[in-house]
């Protein structure tokens, strides 16, 4: 862990660039999957999703719980129904909005992304957002979106254990042909091993608590 901490600390104070993303939500969320090795990020085993990140909202008295009590349904999770926001300016390339949300304990492996959208944010740079609520996506292919714009709601569609937001960046709009790129998030707040960092520009690894300023 100390090597990961050292690597991240080297990025503190890095200037924000046009390529940096905004976290796609409001509030405090936990990084469930993230990093550049399979032991901290299962997405590293899928070329298009390499460096992908999974976020779950936390709450409760400790601000570390994924749900209140023992969840029995998707609505018990803090992530459920939270707005999903555009991480950058761009153009919507594709949208899926009609997949059902899975009851807790079931998955849709046939449609792993569930309700999702792809945004072109730069040349050969496409942001993929997945697992949204059925019917909640408020944009369509061809729409121009602005950073922080509401796109839909966090759901439990696709190959999803419980409600969360999946984000990854790839070099083509085709999930089956793309190669993943490391998403860098600019000027965010991070809690790492109990320490607070404000306004940093970092890649994300599993185990961080993150929020926008």
Language model features: what each stretch is:
Residues 20-34, 40-42, 65, 111, ...:
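Acidic, glycine-rich catalytic/binding loops that coordinate metals and/or anionic ligands
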Residues 1-4:
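Positively charged n-region of N-terminal signal peptides that target proteins for export
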Residues 29, 82-92:
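Generic structural motif
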Residues 125-148:
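Short histidine-centered loop motifs in beta-beta connectors
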Residues 13-15:
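N-terminal signal peptide c-region/cleavage motif recognized by signal peptidases
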Residues 18-62, 67-71, 75-77:
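Non-catalytic extracellular/periplasmic "stalk"
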Residues 90-92, 142-154:
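A structural signal for short beta-strand/turn segments enriched in small hydrophobics and glycine
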Residues 69-71, 77-79, 91-133:
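Zn2+-dependent peptidoglycan hydrolase active-site motif and core
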């Amino acid at each position: 862990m100390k090597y990961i901490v050292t690597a991240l600390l080297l990025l503190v104070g890095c200037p924000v660039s046009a390529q940096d993303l905004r976290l796609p939500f409001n509030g405090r969320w936990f990084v469930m999957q993230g990093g550049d090795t399979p032991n901290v990020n299962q997405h590293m085993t899928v070329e298009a999703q390499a460096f992908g990140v999974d976020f779950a909202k936390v709450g409760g008295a400790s601000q570390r719980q994924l749900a209140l009590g023992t969840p029995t349904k998707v609505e018990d999770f803090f992530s459920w129904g939270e707005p999903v926001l555009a991480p950058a300016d761009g153009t919507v390339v594709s949208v899926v909005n009609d997949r059902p949300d899975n009851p807790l304990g079931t998955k849709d492996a046939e449609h792993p992304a569930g309700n999702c959208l792809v945004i072109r944010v730069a040349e050969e740079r496409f942001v993929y957002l997945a697992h949204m609520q059925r019917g909640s996506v408020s944009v369509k292919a061809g729409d121009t979106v602005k950073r922080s714009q509401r796109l839909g709601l966090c759901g439990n569609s696709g190959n999803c254990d419980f409600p969360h937001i999946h984000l990854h960046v790839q070099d083509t709009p085709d999930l089956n042909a793309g190669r993943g790129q490391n998403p860098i998030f600019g000027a965010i707040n991070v809690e790492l091993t109990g320490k607070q960092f404000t306004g940093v520009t970092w890649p994300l690894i599993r185990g961080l608590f993150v929020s926008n300023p």
